[in-house]
């Protein structure tokens, strides 16, 4: 069709100078093209079979890869492939609310805009914490606010790479603050959409489950690159089991935010993981940092 041809030419031209938006562009998924002829629907829980036209086997391998990367408990982790980081954050907050219905959500002024929207959708109470100049949480302000609300369960949205400055909140410091004020009922969700994957590969991962995270969300299209936005959310399995319910007509548990989910998205992430491998991803992360430093230095020369 002429209109599609014209639009393709416009996109191809734009792609030549398209920088600054957090998506990778050096990907090739042509081997997956034949699967676009089929409606692969990963409806429901990835670890429970549903219909015959699904790609859950690939989704489960993706979940296991990220569970290992983020050092999730061996026998107590679960997750699914999302439509992106915002959905992953919504899921983390949803689980936290079900565990602590009277909990107060704490997030910084540098937090992604979707979090405030998710809090509104879930009808949760929240407090905004000041950010330091670099975008990281102001822990002194966090402590002051905690003292005023010690009677409430604490739900923290920790940023692992803010949108504008790529700042990272410290989960260990947040945990220390909770311990200092003897707060026993708490939940920390880590928004790793921008930097979570590559920081974990580089070993800068004090936000993982071993360091105190209860759930983590990442974006797939930012670091790996994808023509379709996607992501992954991980949570402790014991928490997920509090919200699952059986749905007879789909033959599986309803444990995800959406019902129908694209099987192709799981295959895209699986393919990227297989193509790059952990060593290849590490090199990719290091190259990205080197390129960013080079660009920064050149811009500073102007």
Where are these regions (language model features)?
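Generic secondary-structure signature for well-ordered alpha-helical cores
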Residues: 67-71, 147-151, 179-183, 238, ...
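Conserved PLP-enzyme active-site core in the AAT-like
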Residues: 57, 75, 80-243, 264
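Amphipathic alpha-helical segments that form well-ordered structural scaffolds
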Residues: 61-65, 91, 118, 268, ...
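Active-site C-terminal subdomain of aminotransferase-like
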Residues: 201, 208-302
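Conserved aromatic-histidine-acidic binding/catalytic patches
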Residues: 50-54, 80, 84, 162, ...
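N-terminal entrance/gating region of PLP-dependent enzymes' catalytic architecture
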Residues: 1-76
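Amphipathic, well-packed alpha-helical segments that form the structural scaffold of globular domains
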Residues: 63-67, 71, 94-97, 120, ...
